Amino acid sequence: MATISAKLVKELRKKTGAGMMDCKKALTETDGDIDKAIDYLREKGIAKAAKKADRIAAEGLVHVETKGNDAVIVEINSETDFVARNEGFQELVKEIANQVLDTKAETVEALMETTLPNGKSVDERIKEAISTIGEKLSVRRFAIRTKTDNDAFGAYLHMGGRIGVLTVVEGSTDEEAARDVAMHIAAINPKYVSSEQVSEEEINHEREVLKQQALNEGKPENIVEKMVEGRLRKYLQEICAVDQDFVKNPDVTVEAFLKTKGGKLVDFVRYEVGEGMEKREENFADEVKGQMK
């Protein structure tokens, strides 16, 4: 049996993108013949998985999972929407979400190294799925949130996971109300919970922009200041969830709606599949609003 050197393993890894242990096993099985080792990895589907690493995966699913006082929202990408509807892929997404909650991993990199109940790492599980499904798959991001027994999580998925929202409502255990607010956030896409989260820098910048707009419109200087403050309030309403008219009842704000339930929105995370990545243009927020009419 040939001696498998680290240099040979490194060369095979470079050619196939497969993991170190997979490469070492392939070389051992093929008596150190690198060409046969490549074929071995291809036959096992491992090299096939590695070759897909340079493809763009901008489709996929967002999923929300809760366990007691912990919740996670996760986005896992695929190359096509067809695969995102695949039952096996959907099960993988749920499996990864539960793994995040069980391990409390802080980064995607750390998550990939964690061990699943079956003894395999998340990285190995993803590669197996790539080989089975035939597309590049990747864990893009996740966020963990916690609450107390007196609070509620709200989870909402649009179109089965094209948009996902996780809300944390303090002071109320009404999960339906928390979900309704999550639905609102999916539709309206606010940037912040409240104006308290908006930096002075952003407010001052917007105030200056609005002032110049008013002056350019030829408004008298003596009313510009009052006009700017009015427009600034409208701007903050557009970006802050609690100040927005509630989509299910526009006669009240989100804050007022939750107050009737004894609760207060303290946090939310909103993911849209592929946002910020190169993909076809679709406005899912407008679609959510359309379904509520």
From Swiss-Prot:
GO cellular component: cytoplasm
Main subcellular localisation: cytoplasm
InterPro entries: EF-Ts_dimer_sf (IPR036402), Transl_elong_EFTs/EF1B (IPR001816), Transl_elong_EFTs/EF1B_dimer (IPR014039), Transl_elong_Ts_CS (IPR018101), UBA-like_sf (IPR009060)
Pfam family, one: EF_TS
Superkingdom in the source lineage: Bacteria
PROSITE patterns named among the record's database cross-references: EF_TS_1, EF_TS_2
Region (Involved in Mg(2+) ion dislocation from EF-Tu), start-end ranges: 80-83
Keywords for the protein's UniProt record, in alphabetical order: Cytoplasm, Elongation factor, Protein biosynthesis
Molecular function terms from GO: translation elongation factor activity
Cellular compartment(s): Cytoplasm
HAMAP family in the cross-refs: EF_Ts (MF_00050)
Family: Belongs to the EF-Ts family.
The protein's role, per its UniProt record: Associates with the EF-Tu.GDP complex and induces the exchange of GDP to GTP. It remains bound to the aminoacyl-tRNA.EF-Tu.GTP complex up to the GTP hydrolysis stage on the ribosome.
PANTHER family: ELONGATION FACTOR TS, ELONGATION FACTOR TS, MITOCHONDRIAL
Full protein name: Elongation factor Ts
